[in-house]
């Protein structure tokens, strides 16, 4: 098992309100620990209220340029839930920007399952 700040934080059980600085901070921590620095930063990362979703990644073409945006809800039941879902969404960012994948829950997506387990993260389709 890997020692990590992520793993140590997964026992936090109080409600977590996300600020933009939190999103930036945890993206960097997860990128360094889980992705070993291989997840490119999306073009846009925002804390944004969204109905029926804790987080999502959107890709679009603007002026012939490929853009990827990551959106996360401003409230989570726990910090652990936020970390779990952000890490999940980061796989989609990685799929779009690193391997040119569709970003679906496919073989590339689930190739991260063992790595997630090392950090106490559960990789699944829905949360």
Where in this protein do the model-derived segments appear?
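Active-site-proximal or metal-binding-adjacent scaffold patches in catalytic folds
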Residues: 1-84, 93-127
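Walker B catalytic acidic pair
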Residues: 89
């Amino acid at each position: 098992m890997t020692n990590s700040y992520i793993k140590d934080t997964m026992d936090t059980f109080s409600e977590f309100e996300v600020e933009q600085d939190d999103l930036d901070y945890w993206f960097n921590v997860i990128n360094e620990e889980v992705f070993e620095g291989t997840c490119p930063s999306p073009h846009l990362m925002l804390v944004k209220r969204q109905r029926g979703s804790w987080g999502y990644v959107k890709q679009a073409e603007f002026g012939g340029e490929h853009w990827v945006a990551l959106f996360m809800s401003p409230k989570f039941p726990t910090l652990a839930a936020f970390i779990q879902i952000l890490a999940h969404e980061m796989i989609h960012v990685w799929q779009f920007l690193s391997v040119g994948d569709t970003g679906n829950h496919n073989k590339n997506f689930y190739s991260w399952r063992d790595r997630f387990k090392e950090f106490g993260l559960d990789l699944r389709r829905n949360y």
